[in-house]
Amino acid sequence: MGCLGNSKTEDQRNEEKAQREANKKIEKQLQKDKQVYRATHRLLLLGAGESGKSTIVKQMRILHVNGFNGDEKATKVQDIKNNLKEAIETIVAAMSNLVPPVELANPENQFRVDYILSVMNVPDFDFPPEFYEHAKALWEDEGVRACYERSNEYQLIDCAQYFLDKIDVIKQDDYVPSDQDLLRCRVLTSGIFETKFQVDKVNFHMFDVGGQRDERRKWIQCFNDVTAIIFVVASSSYNMVIREDNQTNRLQEALNLFKSIWNNRWLRTISVILFLNKQDLLAEKVLAGKSKIELFVLDDRLFQERPFSFIEDYFPEFARYTTPEDATPEPGEDPRVTRAKYFIRDEFLRISTASGDGRHYCYPHFTCAVDTENIRRVFNDCRDIIQRMHLRQYELL
């Protein structure tokens, strides 16, 4: 006599069969997802604020994700106008605060300064024609230009000159930003942003996180399964201070941050690709530094001023530094620029070699994040390094 308790209806058997097939599909998909995950190169962009990390991400979009469409460009118009407004406001506001202060070359422009300062904190500013008129006239004033040349003494966005030079273009009603405009546009990064792209059928995920001090606590969320860290440095920031405290030297902040990442116990096996960024601005500063020392009088006191800051004013060891034998200057590069950029490189390499244990390495590259061809070339050079790191990550090498 059969046991009725073990008998199954046709419907039950069909349901179990369907469940087994569903489980197989899920298992197969999980296996596929695991393979895709393991085959993906995850790159974590780190660095201090305003070093150029987000610009690197934009370049990856231009180079590998079909760039920016019309809608995306349209949404950036307001950000670009805000950059322009912030630039002229910051410069004219700084003129009276510098020591010695800077005066307008044309005193008749004072009413324009008054206008710019009066709209500083206006919410939802609508950029009327008179704003562009006043901004352009002030930007052409030699006193305003002199204040701009001393921008290391206050906090000014890097794109200030670029957008102030384009006032006549930006003010047009039918203005459409170029790729270069989008690369130059500065928007504070807050949080974590992921960009996915593919190069020669290899998947890359690039994570961009805010670089300001209060954003860095979020970095640890991104450390898991990272293939490589791209650490971005504003090489031109040797004579500037960070926004957070207006005291700490920006390049020294980057060196301290690099040291903390290099020695982080969670990252001891993760190699670092070092992007020594803003080489164009570094070259400008170094070459401007050849200006002679000037004297000025303020309140019957004699002051000595270098119109442009020398690296040794901030890093005294630069005075004893000689260009290394492994230096490979760019064609036509001034020897002073070569010496400066390799000094900065070697400051970072001193950190990596001092505490290196053979489990991770530092690969330096000189970059200009707003130069698409430079980033294309550098990233192509880095791909073999990243591939090797990826193979080592999964113990295939």
UniProtKB/Swiss-Prot annotation:
Coiled coil residues, start to end: none
Binding site for Mg(2+): S54, T189
Keywords tagged on the record: Cell membrane, GTP-binding, Lipoprotein, Magnesium, Membrane, Metal-binding, Nucleotide-binding, Palmitate, Transducer
Lipidated sites in chain (S-palmitoyl cysteine): C3
Major location (coarse): membrane
Region G4 motif, annotated ranges: 273-280
Compositional bias annotation for Basic and acidic residues: 8-23
Region G2 motif, annotated ranges: 181-189
G5 motif, as annotated region: 367-372
Subcellular location(s) per record: Cell membrane
Membrane topology: Lipid-anchor
Region of interest: G3 motif: 204-213
Chain positions covered by the region annotation Disordered: 1-23
InterPro entries assigned to the protein according to its UniProt record, in alphabetical order: Gprotein_alpha_S, Gprotein_alpha_su, GproteinA_insert, P-loop_NTPase
GO biological process assignments: adenylate cyclase-activating adrenergic receptor signaling pathway; adenylate cyclase-activating dopamine receptor signaling pathway; adenylate cyclase-activating G protein-coupled receptor signaling pathway; sensory perception of chemical stimulus
Functional description taken from the UniProt entry: Guanine nucleotide-binding proteins (G proteins) function as transducers in numerous signaling pathways controlled by G protein-coupled receptors (GPCRs). Signaling involves the activation of adenylyl cyclases, resulting in increased levels of the signaling molecule cAMP. GNAS functions downstream of several GPCRs, including beta-adrenergic receptors. Stimulates the Ras signaling pathway via RAPGEF2.
This protein's name: Guanine nucleotide-binding protein G(s) subunit alpha
